[in-house]
Amino acid sequence: MSDAGTEEFDEEQGSLGEYEGDRNEAGERHGQGKAVLPRGDTYQGAYENGKRCGQGTYKFKNGARYTGEWYMNLKHGQGVLYYPDGSKYEGSWVDDQRQGHGVYTYPNGDTYDGEWLHHQRHGQGTYTHQETGSQYRGTWVVGNMESTGELIQLNHRYHGNFVNNNPSGPGKYVFDIGCEQHGEYFQLEPDKGEAEEDETLISTTLKWKPKAVTGLSV
């Protein structure tokens, strides 16, 4: 569920390169134009007073491509960024960062549809695993599943609290056969495994303690 492969790519800011297009009275790039930058990146779209501003497409030499809105040379507004690893982000940008609502499609086909802040999953969102169809719907904090959420699996779903991507505390399993199992997740004492010198290997184990089975709540 990591954002591996989502590193942003620096657009060339200081080097003007070659330009063909409209200019204003001051000689600045203004209107529609195309630029070929020294290291091989290209931009085609709108300029305002020498800055990328409005709709445009920026193609990176490494194969990444952004098509969407710009403001003061930064990705800002609605746009799509295609990454070299095959992943894609489509949604809102603020000051060159994924922020607001957007959909990220990962190289393995997994998707995250929800809120972002400073490039990270943050707020309400749904992560869907392409291979199994399982989903997490709920709250995210700085990229992790936190607070109230629902983990949906084949034939059942779990609703409860999450801490650092794991269920924690009271919750319930809801089964398609028409019943609910209420209980609590707690963390067992960590086991210290073998380690070299002063390193310590700690494995975290979660245990579900069932308390009651009821019919489906309305």
UniProtKB/Swiss-Prot annotation:
<protein>
    <recommendedName>
        <fullName>Radial spoke head 1 homolog</fullName>
    </recommendedName>
</protein>
<keyword id="KW-0963">Cytoplasm</keyword>
<feature type="repeat" description="MORN 2">
    <location>
        <begin position="43"/>
        <end position="65"/>
    </location>
</feature>
<feature type="repeat" description="MORN 6">
    <location>
        <begin position="158"/>
        <end position="180"/>
    </location>
</feature>
<dbReference type="GO" id="GO:0007286">
    <property type="term" value="P:spermatid development"/>
</dbReference>
<feature type="repeat" description="MORN 5">
    <location>
        <begin position="112"/>
        <end position="134"/>
    </location>
</feature>
<keyword id="KW-0744">Spermatogenesis</keyword>
<comment type="subunit">
    <text>Component of the axonemal radial spoke complexes. Interacts with septin SEPT7.</text>
</comment>
<feature type="repeat" description="MORN 4">
    <location>
        <begin position="89"/>
        <end position="111"/>
    </location>
</feature>
<feature type="compositionally biased region" description="Basic and acidic residues">
    <location>
        <begin position="20"/>
        <end position="31"/>
    </location>
</feature>
<feature type="compositionally biased region" description="Acidic residues">
    <location>
        <begin position="1"/>
        <end position="13"/>
    </location>
</feature>
<keyword id="KW-0206">Cytoskeleton</keyword>
<keyword id="KW-0469">Meiosis</keyword>
<dbReference type="GO" id="GO:0005634">
    <property type="term" value="C:nucleus"/>
</dbReference>
<dbReference type="InterPro" id="IPR003409">
    <property type="entry name" value="MORN"/>
</dbReference>
<dbReference type="GO" id="GO:0035082">
    <property type="term" value="P:axoneme assembly"/>
</dbReference>
<keyword id="KW-0221">Differentiation</keyword>
<keyword id="KW-0966">Cell projection</keyword>
<dbReference type="GO" id="GO:0001535">
    <property type="term" value="C:radial spoke head"/>
</dbReference>
<dbReference type="GO" id="GO:0036126">
    <property type="term" value="C:sperm flagellum"/>
</dbReference>
<keyword id="KW-0217">Developmental protein</keyword>
<keyword id="KW-0969">Cilium</keyword>
<dbReference type="GO" id="GO:0097729">
    <property type="term" value="C:9+2 motile cilium"/>
</dbReference>
<keyword id="KW-0282">Flagellum</keyword>
<feature type="repeat" description="MORN 3">
    <location>
        <begin position="66"/>
        <end position="88"/>
    </location>
</feature>
<comment type="function">
    <text>Functions as part of axonemal radial spoke complexes that play an important part in the motility of sperm and cilia.</text>
</comment>
<keyword id="KW-0677">Repeat</keyword>
<dbReference type="Pfam" id="PF02493">
    <property type="entry name" value="MORN"/>
</dbReference>
<feature type="repeat" description="MORN 1">
    <location>
        <begin position="19"/>
        <end position="42"/>
    </location>
</feature>
<feature type="region of interest" description="Disordered">
    <location>
        <begin position="1"/>
        <end position="48"/>
    </location>
</feature>
<dbReference type="GO" id="GO:0051321">
    <property type="term" value="P:meiotic cell cycle"/>
</dbReference>
